C-alpha cells in the first residue's frame, strides 16, 4: 500500500466520521437500473395452474430456439454474459435495495430495513456465498445445450407457478457440484434461492437472444458522463486523504464516488482497505465481497475480502476464500503472488492457534513483558478509543497521535488486530447467557479466550489485577497475542458497563466498572497504550452507575468518586462532568441548594471539556460530553433547583439532622415515613419518624401516639386541641390515622363594613347583575324541577331505582380527575337530549369496544331503551373512569350525523383538542416514540383497531407526524395509554397528554335562562361574600395556564390538586386575617378592570370607552400570542364569543383589520397584525434572516470542494443525527426545543444518506430481528444515545416495520441480553465439523457417503438441554438471533433444539444427519427439565405424538441405512479424523460412543437445576418465615380484640333485657291499633280491586288500538317503499332505453354514411383504375386521338367524386352530433347525395384492355376494402376475383365501363357483392356446426400461458405467411413505438396494435404486378391446395359494444373451412361433391335443389345471402341479378 495509486484503492459507502449517517448503496438513481425484475413478479400473479402436457406443447419450440441460439455463441462471450447476469442478480442484494424487489423479499440475506448497507454479518455472508456458488454453476455449463435447455424449462415452470423442486435439484446435481446440495438445506430454505436463480437466468438468456440485448454494454453505460467525472473527482480526493492517513475522511469521499459510480469495483476495494485500517472489519467484508462480485478476477478484491475474514477470526473461511481466489486469478501473476503470501500467513496463524496450550493465560505476563518488547513490535494504540473534537491546538496534536498511532504502528496494528475476534463492534456480540463453544479447530483456537467471551461478570477472571501483575517471559508473537486478549477483555468489560448504563441496569454497570478499576493500575495505564483520560472515564462510569442505583450508600460512594475525579485528575478536563455528577447526587437527595451550587460551578467549567468523548475502546458517545447537551442538562437542573417542588412535610424537631435538611420528601433516598399532627385551630406539625421517636423519648416518656389525641397542641402559641394524627409509611402511604372530632363554638362574625361605590353607574350595574342572577336561578330551578318531573313520569322507577338515582346524583357532585369526562358528566342531559339515533351510537361504541357485549345486551333489554341508553353509557364511563374510552366516546359522538347542531359544534370543539394536541405530543416526545418496537405496536393495533382502521404495518413514526394522519396518531396514543404497563418510560408523557394537552381549558358561555347549567352545586363561603362576576368565563378543566380573572391570576391543575390534597376541610379564613381580607376585597371591587370581552355584554357607555376597552383587550391578546395572521382561527374563535354590541362596532369599522388600524398601537405586516413595539423587532430579525440565507446559499456552492483540514467541533459529523430528549418523571417537564438535529454546516461534507429511507417490509414478511438481538430498555432518566454511526446500536426484538434511522425501536420488556464479543458462531465451511448456530435453519454439511435425505429415525439421540429453545422461522429477512432463538454451546459440541413441523413459514425442517442434534418439539414443555431415556429419545425421533416430530415422506424414502460411524464426528476434530485415534466405546462405562460425555453434561445440567431449586427453596423459606410472623402478630391482635368484644357483648345483653321489657308493653298497644287498621284496609282493598279491573279493561283496549295502528303504518310504509322502488326502476329503465335509442340512431347514421361513402369510394376507385388504363392506352396517340379530352373528363369526374365523399361525410357527422345533442332521427332531414354518372367515353372498350387487367381489378378490390378500414373485410379467395380459367373476365366484372343505357346502381353491383360476401360470412347455424377456431381454443385451454407465446400464436393465425421470428420483429417495432414498453396492455390490445402495424406496412408497400400475378394466378394444383388448407383468414368488422369488449378491438376469426357444404353446412363425407369455377364446393343434391329456384352461386351473392333465420327462410336474390364470379359474358 506504500505505492498508492488511483487504481490501487478507492472507498465506498459507509461514512463513519462520528455522526456521518450510514449511506445505503441504493442511493444511485433509479433510472440507471434496468427494469429487470418484472419477470419475477410472475411468481405472485394470480392464475390457474397450467396442465403439464399443455405447457410442454406450447413452450418446447420457443425454448429450443432460444437454447440453440444461445449455445451457438462463442464460449468466451457466454462467460462474459454469465458474469453480467451474476452482477444483475446480486445487484439488489448487495448494491441497491429496492422496496418492490421480489428478490429482496424472497432472499434471506436482504434486510430491507437495514440502512447500513456496507456491513455484512457472517450469517448473511453464508447465504450470499451459497447463492454465488449456485450462480457460478451456470457459467461452468454455459455452452451445454442440454443443461441450458433444462435451465430455461425450469425457469418457465417456476414463472407459471409449477413446483419444479425435484428438477431444480437434479439440475444442480447434473451440473457437476453435489456439495451444493448439502448446503441448500430443507425445501423451505433453498426454494427462494433456486427460484431466483432459475427465473433470473431464464429471463436474461431470453432477453439476450430475443431482443439482442448486450448486458455488458448496459453495465458499462449505467452512469452518465457527469457522474463519471464526479466519481473520478471524489476518488482523487479520497486518494489524497488516504495518503495523509486520514482514513475516516477518505471513506467519506470514496462513498461519494460510489454514489456516482456504483459499478466501479476499484472503489469498493479501496474503501475496504480504509475500513480495515480503521478497524471496521464487517464493512470491509461487505466491500470486499462487492468487489469480487463486480470483478471476480481482480486479486486485490479477494485479498481485501480474505483480510477482513481473518480480522474477524474466521481463519478457515479466509483460507478457503484464498484458495478459491487463486483459482480465479491464475492469469494474473503479480496478484497471485500476494494471494500466495496471504495463504502462507493464514496457515501460520491457524497452526499457531492450534499449537498453543490450553492451560496458559495470555493476560498474566503482559504488563512486565511490555517494557521488553521492541519498539517495532509495539502494540497498537486503539484508533477508536477516544474520538475527541479538539478546540485547541494542543488537544488537536494529542488526538492526531491517538487516532493514527504513528506510521510505524500501522502494520503492527493490522497484525495484532487479526487475532481480535468479532467483538470489535459492540453491536455484534453473543448473548450473555450463552458462552461460545467451538468444535475442531475453532475449539483449539479459542480455548484461551473462552474464559472471557461472555459479558457476564460471573464468567470473567476473578482478580484481573493479579493476572496483569504475574510475570513470565514469552516470544514477541505470543506477547502480541496476549496483548490482543487483554484488550479484548478490557473492551468486553467496558462494553458491559456502558451497555448496562444505556439499558438502566445500573448494578450490572457498577459491577463491570468496579471489576475494571480493580484490575487497572493508573500508574501502568500507559503500558496498554491508553491515555489517563480513559481511566478517568471508567471512574466516571462507575460514579454514574452508583448514582443510577440511588440508594444512600451508593450515592455517598458516587459523590466520593466524583470528588476523586476533581481532586486527583484535574488536568483531564472532566471537572464539569464531576461537578454535574455531584449536583445530581444532591438532587437525588433533594438538597436543592447544594445541588444548585454544584450545577453553577459545572456551568462555568463547560469550556474546559476536551470535546465530545466516547467510552474507551468504542465509538459510543458519552451524551453528557457534548457541549450542547451538557448545557441543556445544566440549565434544566438549575431551573429545577431554583424552583424546587413543595415538600411533602417539614420537620419541626429542633435537632433534626435528616440529611442536613428539615424538608421531607417522599422521594428522599432515606425516607422512612413521617407523622403529621393537626389541631382544631388548623395547625399542622410534622416530624421525621426518627425525630418523633427521639422527641417522645426525651420529652413525653415514650407516650403512645394515640394518647396525644385531645391533648394540647404542640405549637407554643396555639391553644387548640390535637384532633388528628396521621402516620405515613416509608412508601408514602397512610399507615394509620387517629382522629377526634372537636366541636367548635360558633362565634358571630364581626360585621363587614364595605365602602360604598361613589359611581352611580357602577351601583346601577351591580343591581342589574343581582336581578339577572336571581331571575336565572329561578328559571334554572324551575326548569330542573320540570325535567325531573318528566323523568319520573316517563320512567316511574321502583324504589331501588330511585336509590340508584340518588347515588348517581351524589356521584355527579364528585370531581373527576379527567376533565373531558367531567365535561361529559356535567352536560349529560344535553348530550342525552341532543342524540337522536341512539341505536347507531351503541353499535359504534360496541365496535370500538367501549361497551362489552354484556353491557350492550343489558342496555337493550331495558324497557326504556331509547331514553336510558345514553344515560347508561355516561354512567358506565364515569364508573370505569377510563381516559381512552372517554375519548373514543367523544370521537364517536363527533362522527354521528343525527345530532343537534349546537351539541355537535360543542362536541367537535372538544374532540378537536385531542387532535390538536397529537401533533404537539409527537413533536415533543418523538425521540422516545422512535424507540418503540413497532412489531408489538402493529400486533396491538390489529387486535384493538384492526376492524375499524387500516393496519400500520410497514409504516414509520414520521407517518404519524403528518397532518393528514392525526386520527391514526391519536389512536396510537390511545393504544399506548391502554397498554401503559408495557411502556413505563412513557407514563409521564401520556399523563401530560391526557391531563394537560388533550383537556385544555374549555370555555363554556353562560347561557340564558333555560340553558344555564343547573348541575353545579352552590358552595357558600362564610368569609368571602364576593360573588363571581357575570363577565368572567367558567373554566372547565385547565391543563395549560389561562387567564381566569381580570387581574391575570394564572392557575393550573397542579395547584388545584395540591390545594385539594393539602386542605383538611373546607377553606375558612382565620380570625386574625379576616379584617385584612375584607379590606382587600373592598379595594379589589373598586379598582377591578372590567374590559374582558368574552362571555359578557358591554355596558351602556359611550362609544369611545367601548373602543378603548376593545383596543386594550386586543393589545393584551397580541402580547400573549404574538403577531397573528388576519385569517388565524384564534380571531374567529374569539369573535364567536363577542356580544352583539361588540360585533356591531367591528362591522361599522369595516371589519377587524380596519378597526385595529384605527389605533396607532397596531401595525399590519404581511397581513399579520402586531403591536407597533413588536414590529420593529420583526423587521430586524427578517433582515438578519435574509442575510443568513444568502450566506448559506453561497456556502453550499462549494460544499463538495472545500473540506478543511482542521476539524470543526460544530460540524454535524461530530454530533448525533437523532437527539433524543430525556423523558422526565414529572408530567410538567419542559420540552426542549433543541432536540431536533442541527443543520449541516456549510464547510462540512453533506452526509450522503440524508435522503435514504428505510424500505418497508411486505405485508406477509416475517418479523425482522436486529443484528445482535439485544433489546435496550429505556427508562425515564436515561439520556438516550443518538449517534447513528456509533458502534452501539439499539435493536428490536421483533420488528416488522421500517425504521428511518439506525436507532432501532425497542420493546420495554427485557429479554436475553446479547453482549460480549463472540457473535461469529456460524458454520464457516459446509463440512461435517462446522455446524450452524441453533437459529440458522440450514442443512449442515454431510459426508459424501450420506445421501442428502436422511430419515430422522436413524439418528442417534443426543443429550437434552436444560430448557427448550424455540426456532426462528427460516430464510426470512432476519439474519440474527433474537430472544426467540438461542444457541447453547457446551464442551466441544454444538447441541441445539429445533422444531420439526410441517412446511410452513413458522416451522422449518432440519435434518441433522451426522451431527446428532436432537430434534425437540417447540410445543413440548414437559421436556424442559427432564432427561429422557434412550428409548424415549428414539421414540421422539420416530415421530412421537407428544413432540410432533414429522418427517417429509420424500426425504425419508431416499435412504434407509445410515452408518453408525457418523457419531465419531461429534467428538473428533476434522483434522484428526484420518489419524489413528481410538474411537471405540469405553467399556464398561459406555455402550455407545459419547455416552460418558453425555452423562457428564446431564449431570452438570442436574447440578445447575439442583442449585436453582435450592435457591428457590431458600427464598420460599424466608418468605414463609415472614408470613408466619405476620400471621402470629395478627393472631395476637385478634385475641385481644375478642376479649374486648366479649366484654362489650355482656354490656349489650344487659341493655337488651331492659329494652325487651319496654318493647313488650309497646307491643300490646300496637296490637290494638292493628285491629282497627285491618278493618280500614279491607275497605280500601275492595275499592282498589274494583278500580284495577276497570283499568285492566281499558289497558287491553288501548293495546289493541296500538297494535292495529302499528300494522296499518307498517303496510303503508311497505307500499310506499314499493312504489318508490318502482318509480326509481322506471326512471333507470327510461334512462337506459333513451341511451340505447340514441346509440341506435347514431349507429344507423353511421351505417348510412358508410354505405354511401362506400358507393362513392367504389366509383372513385373505378375512375382511378380507368384513368390508369387510359394512361396505358395514351402511349399510342394515333390510335386514340380524343384521349386527352377523355382523360380530363375522367379527372374532373374523379375530383367531383372526392368532393362528394367529403360532403357526405360532413353532413352525416353533423347529423350524428345533432342526435348526440338531443335531436331525433325522424326530425332531421335526409342527407342528399347527388347522383354522379361516368363521363361519356367511346375511346376504350372493355374488350380492348390488356390481359393484366385482372390483376389490377384485384388490386382495386383490395384498395376499396382498405379504404373502408374496419367496416369491411378482405376476402382473398381467388374465386372472388374470377382468376380461374378466363383471366379476361375479371375486368368486365370489377371495372365496368359506362354503358349508355345502364344506370349507376347496376354498374356497382359486382364490387358491392364482392365486398359484402366477406361481411355476411357466418350464420348462427354455421357457428353451431363448425368447430371452435384453433386460435381461440388454444387461448381457452392455455389461459395462464406465457403472454409472448400466446401473442405469437394469435398473430400466426391472422398472418400465416409470416414465421415467428418476423412476427417477433413486428412486436419489437410496436414496443419501440410505445415508449419501449408494453406493460399495462392486455394480450388482445397488443395483438390489435401489431395487426394494425402489419396492415400499415402492407399498405405502404406498392403492389407488385408480377408478385400478385404469381400469388393469385391459378395453377393446376390450386383447387386441391385450397381445398386441403381451407379458406384463408378473414378480418371481421367489430359488432357494437358488448360487455367486456371494446369497439376498437379487432377480433380475429377463422373463416369456414372448405371441408363443408356452403348450403347445408355439413362436412363432405363422400365424393359426391360439385366444385364451381369460383372455388366454392357443394353437395350435388344441394346444388340441384338450389338451381331449381336460383341461377347464381350461393356464396357470392349480395349482403342478405345468409340471414339469421333457418335455411328455408333465407332471402335469395332475384334471377335477373348477375353472378360475376360464376357466369360468363
UniProtKB/Swiss-Prot annotation:
Source organism, top-level taxon: Eukaryota
Pathway: Protein modification; protein ubiquitination
Basic residues bias: start-end ranges: 1019-1029
Subcellular locations according to the entry: Nucleus; Cytoplasm; Golgi apparatus
GO BP field: protein K48-linked ubiquitination; ubiquitin-dependent protein catabolic process
Residue ranges, compositional bias (Basic and acidic residues): 793-805, 1894-1912
SUPFAM superfamilies: RING/U-box, TPR-like
EC number: 2.3.2.27
Organism: Homo sapiens
Function text: E3 ubiquitin-protein ligase which catalyzes the formation of 'Lys-48'-polyubiquitin chains. Mediates the ubiquitination and subsequent degradation of phosphorylated Akt (AKT1, AKT2 and AKT3) in the nucleus. Acts as a terminal regulator of Akt signaling after activation; its phosphorylation by Akt, which is a prerequisite for ubiquitin ligase activity, suggests the existence of a regulation mechanism required to control Akt levels after activation.
UniProt protein name: E3 ubiquitin-protein ligase TTC3
Post-translational changes noted in the entry: Phosphorylation on Ser-378 by Akt is required for ubiquitin ligase activity. Proteolytically cleaved into differently sized N- and C-terminal fragments.
Keyword Cell membrane: no
SMART domains in the cross-refs: RING, TPR
Tissue specificity annotation: Found in all tissues examined.
Region (Disordered): 423-458, 786-805, 1012-1068, 1215-1295, 1773-1842, 1894-1944, 2004-2025
Keywords, in A-Z order: Cytoplasm, Golgi apparatus, Metal-binding, Nucleus, Phosphoprotein, Repeat, TPR repeat, Transferase, Ubl conjugation pathway, Zinc, Zinc-finger
Residues bearing PTM Phosphoserine: 378, 1009, 1061
Chain's gene name: TTC3
GO cellular component: cytosol; Golgi apparatus; nucleolus; nucleoplasm; nucleus
Lineage: Eukaryota, Metazoa, Chordata, Craniata, Vertebrata
Amino acid at each position: 500500500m506504500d505505492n498508492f495509486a488511483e487504481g490501487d484503492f478507492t472507498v465506498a459507502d459507509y461514512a463513519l466520521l462520528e455522526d456521518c449517517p450510514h449511506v445505503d448503496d441504493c442511493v444511485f438513481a433509479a433510472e440507471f437500473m434496468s427494469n429487470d425484475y418484472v419477470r419475477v413478479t410472475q411468481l405472485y400473479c394470480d392464475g390457474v395452474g397450467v396442465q403439464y402436457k399443455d405447457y410442454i406443447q406450447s413452450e418446447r419450440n420457443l425454448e429450443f430456439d432460444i437454447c440453440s441460439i444461445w449455445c451457438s455463441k462463442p464460449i468466451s462471450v457466454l462467460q462474459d454474459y454469465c458474469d453480467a447476469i451474476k452482477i444483475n442478480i446480486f445487484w439488489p442484494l448487495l448494491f441497491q435495495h429496492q422496496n418492490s424487489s421480489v428478490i429482496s423479499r424472497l432472499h434471506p440475506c436482504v434486510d430491507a430495513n437495514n440502512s447500513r448497507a456496507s456491513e455484512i454479518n457472517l450469517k448473511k455472508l453464508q447465504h450470499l456465498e451459497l447463492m454465488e456458488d449456485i450462480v457460478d454453476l451456470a457459467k461452468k455449463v454455459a455452452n451445454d445445450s442440454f443443461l441450458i435447455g433444462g435451465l430455461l424449462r425450469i425457469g418457465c415452470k417456476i414463472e407459471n407457478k409449477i413446483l419444479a423442486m425435484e428438477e431444480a435439484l437434479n439440475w444442480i446435481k447434473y451440473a457437476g457440484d453435489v456439495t451444493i446440495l448439502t448446503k441448500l438445506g430443507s425445501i423451505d430454505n433453498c426454494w427462494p434461492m433456486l427460484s431466483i436463480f432459475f427465473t433470473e437466468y431464464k429471463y436474461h438468456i431470453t432477453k439476450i437472444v430475443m431482443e439482442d440485448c448486450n448486458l455488458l454494454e448496459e453495465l458499462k453505460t449505467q452512469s452518465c458522463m457527469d457522474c463519471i467525472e464526479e466519481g473520478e473527482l471524489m476518488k482523487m480526493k479520497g486518494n489524497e486523504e488516504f495518503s495523509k492517513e486520514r482514513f475516516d475522511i477518505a471513506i467519506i469521499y470514496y462513498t461519494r464516488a460510489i454514489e456516482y459510480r456504483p459499478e466501479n469495483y476499484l472503489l469498493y476495494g479501496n474503501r475496504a482497505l480504509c475500513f480495515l485500517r480503521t478497524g471496521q472489519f464487517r464493512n470491509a467484508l461487505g466491500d470486499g465481497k462487492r468487489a469480487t462480485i463486480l470483478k471476480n478476477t481482480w486479486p486485490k478484491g479477494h485479498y481485501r475480502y480474505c483480510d477482513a475474514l481473518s480480522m474477524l477470526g474466521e481463519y478457515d473461511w479466509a483460507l478457503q476464500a484464498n484458495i478459491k481466489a487463486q483459482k480465479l486469478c491464475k492469469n494474473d501473476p503479480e496478484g497471485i503472488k500476494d494471494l500466495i503470501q496471504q495463504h502462507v500467513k493464514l496457515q501460520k496463524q491457524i497452526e499457531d492457534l492450534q499449537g498453543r496450550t490450553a492451560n496458559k493465560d495470555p493476560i498474566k505476563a503482559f504488563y512486565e513483558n511490555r517494557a521488553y518488547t521492541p519498539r517495532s513490535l509495539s502494540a497498537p494504540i486503539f484508533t477508536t478509543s477516544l474520538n475527541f473534537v479538539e478546540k485547541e491546538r494542543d488537544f488537536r496534536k494529542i488526538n492526531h497521535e491517538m487516532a493514527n498511532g504513528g506510521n510505524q504502528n500501522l502494520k503492527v496494528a493490522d497484525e495484532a488486530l487479526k487475532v481480535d475476534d468479532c467483538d470489535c463492534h459492540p453491536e455484534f456480540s453473543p448473548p450473555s447467557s450463552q458462552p461460545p463453544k467451538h468444535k475442531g479447530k475453532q475449539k483449539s483456537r479459542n480455548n484461551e479466550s473462552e474464559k472471557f467471551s461472555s459479558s457476564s461478570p460471573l464468567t470473567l477472571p476473578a482478580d484481573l489485577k493479579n493476572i496483569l501483575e504475574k510475570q513470565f517471559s514469552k516470544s514477541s508473537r505470543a506477547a502480541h497475542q496476549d496483548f490482543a486478549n487483554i484488550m479484548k477483555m478490557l473492551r468486553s468489560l467496558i462494553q458491559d458497563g456502558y451497555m448496562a448504563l444505556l439499558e438502566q441496569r445500573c448494578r450490572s454497570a457498577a459491577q463491570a466498572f468496579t471489576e475494571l478499576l480493580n484490575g487497572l493500575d493508573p500508574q501502568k495505564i500507559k503500558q496498554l497504550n491508553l491515555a489517563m483520560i480513559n481511566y478517568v472515564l471508567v471512574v466516571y462510569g462507575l460514579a454514574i452507575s452508583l448514582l443510577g442505583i440511588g440508594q444512600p450508600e451508593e450515592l455517598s460512594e458516587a459523590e466520593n468518586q466524583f470528588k476523586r475525579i476533581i481532586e486527583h485528575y484535574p488536568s483531564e478536563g472532566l471537572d464539569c462532568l464531576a461537578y454535574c455528577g455531584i449536583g445530581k447526587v444532591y438532587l437525588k437527595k433533594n438538597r436543592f441548594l447544594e445541588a444548585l451550587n454544584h450545577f453553577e460551578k459545572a456551568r462555568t467549567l463547560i469550556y474546559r471539556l476536551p470535546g465530545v468523548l466516547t467510552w474507551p475502546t468504542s465509538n459510543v458517545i458519552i451524551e453528557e460530553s457534548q457541549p450542547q447537551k451538557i448545557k441543556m442538562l445544566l440549565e434544566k437542573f438549575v431551573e429545577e433547583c431554583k424552583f424546587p417542588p413543595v415538600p411533602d412535610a417539614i420537620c419541626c424537631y429542633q435537632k433534626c439532622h435528616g440529611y442536613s435538611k428539615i424538608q421531607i420528601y417522599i422521594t428522599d433516598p432515606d425516607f422512612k415515613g413521617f407523622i403529621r399532627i393537626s389541631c382544631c385551630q388548623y395547625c399542622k406539625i410534622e416530624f421525621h419518624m426518627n425525630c418523633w421517636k427521639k422527641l417522645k423519648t426525651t420529652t413525653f416518656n415514650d407516650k403512645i401516639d394515640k394518647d396525644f389525641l385531645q391533648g394540647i397542641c404542640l405549637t407554643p402559641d396555639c391553644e387548640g386541641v390535637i384532633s388528628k394524627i396521621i402516620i405515613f409509611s416509608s412508601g408514602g402511604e397512610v399507615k394509620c390515622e387517629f382522629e377526634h372530632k372537636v366541636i367548635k363554638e360558633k362565634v358571630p362574625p364581626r360585621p363587614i363594613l364595605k365602602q360604598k361605590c361613589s359611581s352611580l353607574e357602577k351601583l346601577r350595574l351591580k343591581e342589574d347583575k343581582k336581578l339577572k342572577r336571581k331571575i336565572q336561578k329561578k328559571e334554572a330551578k324551575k326548569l330542573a324541577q320540570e325535567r325531573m318531573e318528566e323523568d319520573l313520569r316517563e320512567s316511574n322507577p321502583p324504589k331501588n331505582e330511585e336509590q340508584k338515582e340518588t347515588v348517581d346524583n351524589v356521584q355527579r357532585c364528585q370531581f373527576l380527575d379527567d376533565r373531558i369526562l367531567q365535561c361529559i358528566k356535567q352536560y349529560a342531559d344535553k348530550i342525552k337530549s341532543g342524540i337522536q339515533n341512539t341505536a347507531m351510537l351503541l353499535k359504534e361504541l360496541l365496535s370500538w369496544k367501549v361497551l362489552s357485549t354484556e353491557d350492550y345486551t343489558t342496555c337493550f333489554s331495558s324497557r326504556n331503551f331509547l331514553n336510558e341508553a345514553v344515560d347508561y353509557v355516561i354512567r358506565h364511563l364515569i364508573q370505569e373512569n377510563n381516559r381512552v374510552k372517554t375519548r373514543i366516546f367523544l370521537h364517536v359522538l363527533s362522527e354521528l350525523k343525527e345530532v343537534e347542531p349546537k351539541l355537535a359544534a360543542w362536541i367537535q370543539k372538544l374532540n378537536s383538542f385531542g387532535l390538536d394536541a397529537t401533533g404537539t405530543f409527537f413533536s415533543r416526545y418523538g425521540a422516545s416514540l422512535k424507540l418503540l418496537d413497532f412489531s408489538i405496536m402493529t400486533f396491538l393495533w390489529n387486535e384493538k383497531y384492526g376492524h375499524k382502521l387500516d393496519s400500520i404495518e410497514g409504516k414509520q413514526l414520521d407517518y404519524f407526524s403528518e397532518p393528514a394522519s392525526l386520527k391514526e396518531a391519536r389512536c396510537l396514543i390511545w393504544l399506548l395509554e391502554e397498554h401503559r404497563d408495557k411502556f413505563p418510560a412513557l407514563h409521564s408523557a401520556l399523563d401530560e397528554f391526557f391531563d394537560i394537552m388533550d383537556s385544555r381549558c374549555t370555555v363554556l358561555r353562560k347561557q340564558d335562562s333555560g340553558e344555564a347549567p343547573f348541575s353545579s352545586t352552590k358552595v357558600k363561603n362564610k368569609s368571602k361574600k364576593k360573588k363571581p362576576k357575570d363577565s368572567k368565563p367558567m373554566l372547565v378543566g385547565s391543563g395549560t395556564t389561562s387567564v381566569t380573572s381580570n387581574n391575570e391570576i394564572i392557575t393550573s391543575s397542579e395547584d388545584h390538586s395540591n390545594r385539594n390534597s393539602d386542605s383538611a376541610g373546607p377553606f375558612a379564613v382565620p380570625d386574625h386575617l379576616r379584617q385584612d381580607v375584607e379590606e382587600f376585597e373592598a379595594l379589589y371591587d373598586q379598582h377591578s378592570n372590567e374590559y374582558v370581552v368574552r362571555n359578557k355584554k358591554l355596558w351602556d357607555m359611550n362609544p369611545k370607552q367601548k373602543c378603548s376597552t376593545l383596543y386594550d383587550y386586543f393589545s393584551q391578546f397580541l402580547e400573549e400570542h404574538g403577531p397573528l395572521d388576519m385569517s388565524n382561527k384564534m380571531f374567529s374563535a374569539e369573535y364567536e364569543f363577542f356580544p352583539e354590541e361588540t360585533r356591531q362596532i367591528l362591522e361599522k369599522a369595516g371589519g377587524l383589520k380596519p378597526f385595529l388600524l384605527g389605533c396607532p398601537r397596531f401595525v399590519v405586516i404581511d397581513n399579520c397584525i402586531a403591536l407597533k413595539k413588536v414590529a420593529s423587532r420583526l423587521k430586524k430579525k427578517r433582515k438578519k434572516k435574509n442575510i443568513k440565507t444568502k450566506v448559506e446559499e453561497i456556502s453550499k456552492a462549494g460544499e463538495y470542494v472545500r473540506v478543511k483540514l482542521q476539524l470543526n467541533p460544530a460540524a454535524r459529523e461530530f454530533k448525533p443525527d437523532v437527539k433524543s430528549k430525556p423523558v422526565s418523571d414529572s408530567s410538567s417537564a419542559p420540552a426542549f426545543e433543541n432536540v431536533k438535529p442541527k443543520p449541516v454546516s456549510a464547510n462540512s461534507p453533506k452526509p450522503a444518506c440524508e435522503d435514504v429511507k428505510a424500505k418497508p417490509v411486505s405485508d406477509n414478511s416475517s418479523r425482522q430481528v436486529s443484528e445482535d438481538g439485544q433489546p435496550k430498555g429505556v427508562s425515564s432518566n436515561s439520556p438516550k444515545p443518538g449517534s447513528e454511526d456509533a458502534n452501539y446500536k439499539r435493536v428490536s426484538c421483533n420488528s416488522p416495520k421500517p425504521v428511518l434511522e439506525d436507532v432501532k425501536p425497542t420493546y420495554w420488556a427485557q429479554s436475553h441480553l446479547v453482549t460480549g464479543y463472540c457473535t461469529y458462531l456460524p458454520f464457516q465451511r459446509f463440512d461435517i465439523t462446522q455446524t450452524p448456530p441453533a437459529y440458522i435453519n440450514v442443512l449442515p454439511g454431510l459426508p459424501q457417503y450420506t445421501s442428502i435425505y436422511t430419515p430422522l429415525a436413524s439418528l442417534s439421540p443426543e443429550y437434552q438441554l436444560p430448557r427448550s429453545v424455540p426456532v426462528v422461522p427460516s430464510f426470512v429477512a432476519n439474519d440474527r438471533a433474537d430472544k426467540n432463538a438461542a444457541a447453547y454451546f457446551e464442551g466441544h459440541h454444538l447441541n441445539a433444539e429445533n422444531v420439526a413441523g410441517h412446511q410452513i413459514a413458522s416451522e422449518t425442517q432440519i435434518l441433522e444427519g451426522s451431527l446428532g442434534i436432537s430434534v425437540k418439539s417447540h410445543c413440548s414443555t414437559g421436556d424442559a427439565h427432564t432427561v429422557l431415556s434412550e428409548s424415549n429419545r428414539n421414540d421422539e425421533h420416530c415421530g412421537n405424538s407428544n413432540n410432533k416430530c414429522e418427517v417429509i415422506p420424500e426425504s425419508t424414502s431416499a435412504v434407509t441405512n445410515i452408518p453408525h460411524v457418523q457419531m465419531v464426528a461429534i467428538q473428533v476434530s476434522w483434522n484428526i479424523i484420518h489419524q489413528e485415534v481410538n474411537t471405540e466405546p469405553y467399556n464398561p462405562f459406555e455402550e455407545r460412543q459419547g455416552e460418558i460425555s453425555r452423562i457428564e453434561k446431564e449431570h452438570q445440567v442436574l447440578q445447575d437445576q439442583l442449585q436453582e431449586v435450592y435457591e428457590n427453596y431458600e427464598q420460599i423459606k424466608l418468605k414463609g418465615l415472614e408470613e408466619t410472623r405476620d400471621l402470629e402478630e395478627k393472631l395476637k391482635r385478634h385475641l385481644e380484640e375478642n376479649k374486648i368484644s366479649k366484654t362489650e357483648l355482656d354490656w349489650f345483653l344487659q341493655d337488651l333485657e331492659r329494652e325487651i321489657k319496654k318493647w313488650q308493653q309497646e307491643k300490646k298497644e300496637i296490637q290494638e291499633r292493628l285491629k282497627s287498621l285491618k278493618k280500614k284496609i279491607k275497605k280500601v282493598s275492595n275499592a282498589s280491586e274494583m278500580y284495577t279491573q276497570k283499568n285492566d279493561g281499558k289497558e287491553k283496549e288501548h293495546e289493541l288500538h296500538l297494535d292495529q295502528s302499528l300494522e296499518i303504518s307498517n303496510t303503508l310504509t311497505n307500499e310506499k317503499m314499493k312504489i318508490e322502488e318502482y318509480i326509481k326502476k322506471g326512471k333507470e329503465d327510461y334512462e337506459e332505453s333513451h341511451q340505447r335509442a340514441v346509440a341506435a340512431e347514431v349507429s344507423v347514421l353511421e351505417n348510412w354514411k358508410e354505405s354511401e361513402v362506400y358507393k362513392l369510394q367504389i366509383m372513385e376507385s373505378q375512375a382511378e383504375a380507368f384513368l390508369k388504363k387510359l394512361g396505358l392506352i395514351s402511349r399510342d396517340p394515333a390510335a386514340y386521338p380524343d384521349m386527352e379530352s377523355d382523360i380530363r373528363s375522367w379527372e374532373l369526374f374523379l375530383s367531383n367524386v372526392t368532393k362528394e365523399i367529403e360532403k357526405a361525410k360532413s353532413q352525416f357527422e353533423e347529423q350524428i352530433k345533432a342526435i348526440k345533442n338531443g335531436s331525433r332521427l325522424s326530425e332531421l332531414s335526409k342527407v342528399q347525395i347527388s347522383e354522379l354518372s361516368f363521363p361519356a367515353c367511346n375511346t376504350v372498350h372493355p374488350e380492348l384492355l390488356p390481359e393484366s387487367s385482372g390483376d389490377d381489378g384485384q388490386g382495386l378490390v383490395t384498395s376499396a376494402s382498405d379504404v373502408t378500414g374496419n367496416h369491411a373485410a378482405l376476402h382473398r379467395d381467388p374465386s372472388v376475383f374470377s382468376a380461374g380459367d378466363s383471366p379476361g373476365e375479371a375486368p368486365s366484372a370489377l371495372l365496368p365501363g359506362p354503358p349508355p343505357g345502364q344506370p349507376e346502381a347496376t354498374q356497382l353491383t359486382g364490387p358491392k357483392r364482392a365486398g359484402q360476401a366477406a361481411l355476411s360470412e357466418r350464420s348462427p347455424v354455421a357457428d353451431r356446426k363448425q368447430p371452435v377456431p384453433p386460435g381461440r381454443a388454444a387461448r381457452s385451454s392455455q389461459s395462464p400461458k406465457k403472454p409472448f407465446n400466446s401473442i405469437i400464436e394469435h398473430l400466426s393465425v391472422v398472418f400465416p405467411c409470416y414465421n415467428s421470428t418476423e412476427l417477433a420483429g413486428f412486436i419489437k417495432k410496436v414496443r419501440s413505438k410505445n415508449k419501449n414498453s408494453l406493460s399495462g396492455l392486455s394480450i388482445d390490445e397488443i395483438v390489435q396494435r401489431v395487426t394494425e402495424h402489419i396492415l400499415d406496412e402492407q399498405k405502404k408497400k406498392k403492389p407488385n404486378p408480377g408478385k400478385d400475378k404469381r400469388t393469385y394466378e391459378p395453377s393446376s394444383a390450386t383447387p386441391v391446395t385450397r381445398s386441403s388448407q381451407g379458406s384463408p383468414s378473414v378480418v371481421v368488422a367489430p359488432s357494437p359494444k358488448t360487455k367486456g369488449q371494446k369497439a376498437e378491438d379487432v377480433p380475429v376469426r377463422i373463416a369456414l373451412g372448405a371441408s363443408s357444404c356452403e348450403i347445408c353446412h355439413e362436412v363432405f363425407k363422400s365424393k359426391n361433391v360439385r366444385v364451381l369455377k369460383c372455388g366454392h364446393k357443394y353437395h350435388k343434391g344441394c346444388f340441384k335443389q338450389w338451381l331449381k329456384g336460383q341461377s347464381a352461386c350461393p356464396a357470392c351473392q349480395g349482403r342478405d345471402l345468409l340471414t339469421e333465420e333457418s335455411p328455408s327462410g333465407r332471402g335469395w336474390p332475384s334471377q335477373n341479378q348477375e353472378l360475376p364470379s360464376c357466369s360468363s359474358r
